[in-house]
Each structure stands twice: as C-alpha cells, then as structure tokens.
C-alpha cells in the first residue's frame, strides 16, 4: 500500500511538471513564442535550434488570414517561418498580449515573405507598439526577411503590437516573441530601446541564442582583421543582472598592435538618433605579476568613462552609458585605448548598442480600455477597426467612438459611444459605467432586455442616452428621471415592456372593473399577508440557517459603491473574481471594494460563498467584511483596506520598500496560522480555506497579517467519520495538497499542507514552482538541497544572515512537516503555532542580545516591526 501511495504521488508531481512545462514553454516563465499562422488545431512544438516551445497565434489576434511559404523554402528556414499571418482587410491589425505592467520585455518580431502568395511583390508596411510607431518593415530591401527587436516596459497589463497598411501591399508577420528581462537592466531615461546590434567578439560563425542566453537575446559573432581573438576554457562568472552567455565571455578581442586602440565605427540609420552602449568585459588571460590591463572608453573623441576600466579575472563587468549619447552626423566612432600605466592592450568580450525610440502618445485610460474590451467581448462585437488602442492614433479611432484627445502626454478619454443597430442582446452591462467621461451613449435599435440600470444616472458626464428600439422592461429609475429634469436627453421609445409613467400602474379600461377588482384584490392581499406570517413563523421555529443576506453588516446599493470608489477610479489589483478598487467610506474609513466581473471565472457562486463565510466568522487575523452589494447584476464585497498589500509583493520586491526581516516574517506566519486555526476549530461548522498562498495574506499599516479570499472555502465536520468531505478539487498549483488532488477528499490538513508551502516561501523567498530548478516544486527542492548538505542556498539571501540560525531551522522543520505528502503525518495548526512562537522567541532573544552590544547609531536596511502575541494559542474572536 505504501509503495502504491508513492506511485500515485510520483504521478502527481510528474503531472504538475508536464502542466508547468506546457504552460511556460521550455522552462522559461513569461516567454511568449507565437508561430504566426500556425493553425489552432496544431499542437505546440519545440523548435529544434533553441528548444523553445512555439504555439499558434490564433488566440492573440481577431483578424488576418494564414499563409505558408513554398515547400522548397521550408527546409532552409526555421519551422516558425514556414507559416505566416497576412492582413488583407482593414488598415490596422493588432496582437493583444497579456503582460506584466512595469516589467522590462524584449519584444522580437520576424518577417519572411517567401513569395507565399505567388505575386512576387514584397510588402512594405509599418509596425506600431501600442499607439506609437515602432518601425517600417520594407521587405523589398531585405528579401531574405528581417527581425526587429525592442526593449520596452508596458504601461498596462495589455500590450498591442500592430501591423499597419501604408500602401498597396499587404502586411504580414512570421513570428512574434516576448522575453521578460530583469527590471534593473536596459533602463532608458525616456522611451524604449530599439535594437541596433548585439555582438560577441569572436571569429566563430555561430549565432548565440537560448539556452546559451537565458533571456534568448541573439548574439552575432564579429571580428576585425586588425584584432586578435583570445579565449579561455575556464568558466567565467556571468551572474550579473545582464547575464550574457558564458560562451561569449570566454572569448574576447584585443588589437594586434599592442599600443593601438580597439576601434569600432558604425553609421546610424537616423543621424539624430540617441544611443545607449552596453559593454561586457572579463579578463580571460592570467596576467603576470607586473602586468596591468587598464583602458579608457572614447566615443567620437570624448572620454566617457570616469576612471580607467580594469576587467576582473574570470568575472563579468558590464559598463554602460547611463545617459543617451549622440554621434556627430550619425557616424559613431568608439575606441578603447590603454592608459599610461597599462602594459597590456584593451580587451572587449561583448558589445550591445540600442537607439532610443520615443513613445510620445499616451495610450487611452486603462480602466476605459478594459471596459470597452469587456463590452466588445460581452456582446460579441466583431469590427475590423476594434483593435489596438481605442482612441489613438486618431486615424485609427474605433468605429462608433469619439475621444477627448487634448495632449499626447495625457491619456485620451472616451466621450461618445454609438452602438446603434449593432445586434446587441442581453442586459445593459455595468462595464459602461467605467467610461467615466462618456457624454453620449447610443444603444438604440438592438435587442437589449432587462431593466434600465440605475448606474446610468451616476455617470455625471452623460448628456445624451438613446435606448430606443430595444426590449427593455420595468420602470425607469427615479434618479434617471431626476437627471432628465436637469437636462439629460433620454430616449426610450420603442420599448413595449418599459413603464414610462411615474406610478407604473396600468390605466383601467372600465370604471366598473375597478369596483369589482379593488375589493377582491384587497381581500387577496390580506389573505397573502396572513399566509406569509404563518409560514414565516413556522420557518423561524425550524433549526435551519438564516438566509445569507440577513445580516447586521451594511448592505450597500450599487450607487453607494460607485460613490465610495469615485466611479472605480483607483484599481488596487485584479483576480479571478474581478477588479479590487480603493474606496472611501464617508470620508472616515478606507475600504477595498471587490467587484464581481461580468466575465468572472469565479462568479456568483463563489461570491455568495465568501459572503456566507465572512458574515459568520470574526477573527483578528481574517480580513474584516465591512459590507456588500447584491443589486440585480451588481455584486461587490467591501473589506477593510490593507494598506501594505499582500505578502507576495513584499517577498518579491514588487511592493518596494525595505526587506522584511526574519522576525517580521515569523510574525506574519504566526498570524496567518492563527487565522487558519480559527477556521479549523473556532468556526461551527469548521471551515477549510482551500487557497492558502502568499497573495492571500494581506498586511495592514502595522504589517499585521490577515487571511483573505474565501471564495473556495468549504465547511466540514470535525471528528467521527466525516472529518473529510469529497469535493471538486480547487486551489492553486504549487500550494495544492497532493493527497487532496489524488483523492478529492478535503480536510483541514489540506490547509496545513498549503501553509507549509507558504512557510517555505517565507523562509527561502523562492518560487513555489520554478522549472529552472532541478526540482521544480519548492518542497522537493528544499529536500534535495538539504540532502546535498548545501544548506546555505535555502535561506533568503536578502536576509544577509541576519537571523537566529536555530529559529530558521526550527521553522524549516515545521514547514517540511506541514508539507508532508501524507496528511496523517502533518501537524494541526495549534501545534504549528506553538512551534512558530518558539522560533520567534529565539529570534527575539538574539535581537535583544545584539541590541545590548550595538551602538545606538546602528541602522539596518531591513524592515523591523515590533512583535507581540498573546500567550493563549486558542483562536480568539474579535
């Protein structure tokens, strides 16, 4: 039986490996590799040269047709160039890519015409990134194809790459690739960085790409006749932020004439271009005792380094220009010249040059872009012009839209939307209200049904609303009638089921009918009231839970939600439920408003589950529900505002600020454990959270931790034969209990497993799943490292050894016991809390001892938070 269990667990982790491998593509998180024109029904494939997984572009673009180069050319080119996508319809056709806002990306687009259409006319067209022009593609000049690269930081979570028709020929594209880079590399003062060249100095003929370059940059070999190539067989430490290929750093060039400069000259496409230089140096020769290699960097006669450059032996050094440079007349002359004290000539291993691409036009307001895209998706709108940025450039304004474009540096706003006669059906969705500057809305002559939503009255900029010719019903909201009296033009004619009068009671046809119907109706009403009273009394005597909406918690109207969020002005984040917005409650309390998206993957069921749970649980380490909104098709949860975000942001550095020290991390872990303990033993019935992870641990202004996101939580009976319940497996990969995954049997020990993974994340600051490791799962990786005896790799290096060793290793033992594959061998949360408090006591003792020996002026770059806890380990209600 034991062997069978291990077989199942092995299959589980193998399945996890396959899922991650498929999703990330050749072990590279964040890589997007699109083979343009590859049919959607063809599976992803591994490209033989690089080992990178390519897949179809079908899900990233709404338009275009697919083509294929002739068979005789396919064998001569990489597989991803065999197919292509071309765009005979429309002027601008755009890829829409999901990216991480503020992350540095290398974006590569490849174009190979190959006479796929038999016309033998190479196309010429423009390529845009967002609303700005990137470059012109002229395949008449480069018939063998071309590759364009740019390093760019997206301003939102959505990135558009657009192909723009500029003449008679038809735009096309062969491949589109995105590669995330380190955020502290390739920083431009403004704009983005267009690839000019990237070379390693060698007489080799091999183009270097992934996997030799972890970021999949392409390095071209280059050498001049007046240079000597030198090389080494020793490994060079290439681990700086730029991380150039090991192969490139093992080679270098020096001038043949030992007293000469190492000189490179190149001409810019545009004489006015500004450039950034990146040079990678490593000393790969063993120098004699009296030898010195030191040199200056001179660009067009100006020394641009502040002191002599001396490469270190077998270590990388990257020198770069922090400010953009210009070359007179567009001709750049760079020289490395040895200094007077140098006995050896200059040396260069690898070299990169980029030109600055200014992106002056701001993209349309992000909230409005999300809203109009959701409207497009909800109603299934298919318009060739509805691609790329909705408002800019002006010549590509979406059909039916008008925008306020006052200044290219300010985000445009949508002020008019005409969807008349567009075949719309369903209700008027709430996404319209996020168009906060909308002045005119025309939804006439469609098949819209349901009520006229009250949120239209809260859209203060609206001057004209045309809802005529639909199938709307019910009454017109009084607030909208009030706006009408203030000057709003409202047209609702042609909606047969819509009540236009103030009372919404049909006029009687005959007075005699009133005399008969009125008494009968009165008697019927009295009978109904009596029956309802008796029914309610009977129901109240039964031992059943109350309806979930009956609560002392505040129930807000949707208009109140809009008021507290200032019309959804400040998004805090986004999850499976929808967008979370910042709110202000009566000017006295900050709140977080979690709004259910119309296209939410969780939906109303999880919304209801979360409300039901939060209405009956009260604990200082569970996020506090201030109120909720359940109004027609509008659902929202209003929580207390947690000003320091989530734990994952602090561990990853995305939140900024100081590093969380070890004591603070233990504090957070204990508080999260207390919240779980309350769910497991303090609730009746007991609850399992099912989604314990670092993004669901929120931190207030004092870094006190609270557990959030209860949409997946489930109740269970403690003790007896029903201590486990069978459910559909849910949770987050990496944190998910493998035993629960295999059996679908849920218990509180599933949360314990997830907490163990969370604790490992806190200790190591490693990804929970990382395919670049030999053991991708964090628990397996820690076990592997411990067995190797190389324990220095385990603890987060950002702590710089500033912790009590016993405390850390005791916490590690707790984490590993929680993450035991067998649920019966895992501790309960009360035992976990006792052990973690012992860890905290050890750390506090170390701090007290150190404080006695430290000068009062000592400072630390780590964040210190005062830690205090009750000695009672039982859950305490607030």
From Swiss-Prot:
GO terms for biological process: embryo development ending in seed dormancy; endosperm development. The modification Phosphothreonine is found at residues 557, 727, 732. Residues 566-840 form the Protein kinase domain. Residues 849-869 have a biased composition (Polar residues). Pfam families: LRR_8, Malectin_like, PK_Tyr_Ser-Thr. GO terms for cellular component: membrane. Its EC number is 2.7.11.1. Residues 849-878 are annotated as: Disordered. Residues 26-514 are extracellular. The active site is at 691 (proton acceptor). It catalyses: L-seryl-[protein] + ATP = O-phospho-L-seryl-[protein] + ADP + H(+); L-threonyl-[protein] + ATP = O-phospho-L-threonyl-[protein] + ADP + H(+). Keywords: ATP-binding, Developmental protein, Glycoprotein, Kinase, Leucine-rich repeat, Membrane, Nucleotide-binding, Phosphoprotein, Receptor, Repeat, Serine/threonine-protein kinase, Signal, Transferase, Transmembrane, Transmembrane helix. It is found in: Membrane. The chain crosses the membrane at residues 515-535. Disruption phenotype: Endosperm development arrested. Receptor-like serine/threonine-kinase required during the endosperm development in seeds. This is Probable LRR receptor-like serine/threonine-protein kinase MEE39. It comes from Arabidopsis thaliana (Mouse-ear cress). The lineage of its organism: Eukaryota, Viridiplantae, Streptophyta, Embryophyta, Tracheophyta.
